[in-house]
Amino acid sequence: MKKNEDSMKQKIKRILGEMNIFLGSVEAQRRKDGLILEIDKLFDFILTLNGGENSRSQFKQDIFALMVNKFKEGGYFVEFGATNGCDISNTYVLEKQFGWRGILAEPAKMWHKNLIKNRDCNVEFDCVWHTSGELLDFDMVKEGELSTLSIFSNSDEYAKARQEKTTYVVNTISLIALLKKYNAPKEIDYLSVDTEGSELDILSAFDFNEYRFNCITIEHNFTENREKLKFLLEQNGYKRVFEHLSKWDDWYIPESLDSY
């Protein structure tokens, strides 16, 4: 298996070199329609490599994180909400195939048993929020991926799907407290944020001067908070990229990464 994984990584790196891919800004990408097409094809090609050990992300977020980080091994991720850590996971492949470590956070009880079983990293069951130590109502819904804090259950197009739910109280932890609790490095390779509505509240309270992220993916579900998140990230030195691929996520990299 190790030999096959090494071969896969070498093939990816060779293809990237031959295609001379540079992610660039969204504006630059739009001027290069052919390049956009080739990048999209490359993502699809990468998914076919190494048999069943493919992307677990819904929109190839794991492949994006690997590309930005030059397919490094031993990177560091932070992902919330993590669900069961395997299906529709943005970090499963990073951990299992590339030896990354990191933190997963998931307050929905329905996922906890399998999350512990499926992953070998730090797992936090408190709910990530703008403040630590609050006790808030949380709606765990039948479609588990849509579970969220009760105050956000009616905030997007999935409000009707959240009507069948179990509500219970969760303790909260801020993002900065989460990172410090698990001694996260000051430079984190990938941050994945999918909390069904509370993303802006969480990131607005975060001190971006304390930690740097090589890439960030944030679910927005086309709510009014999408552009507010973009403004917040831009004010803190990040730029949005690959809008044509990211669907109801937005993907960000540091402005300083000019070669991407």
Name every feature range the model reports, one short phrase each:
Residues 2-260:
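Phosphate/nucleotide-binding beta-alpha loop and adjacent structural elements of enzyme active sites
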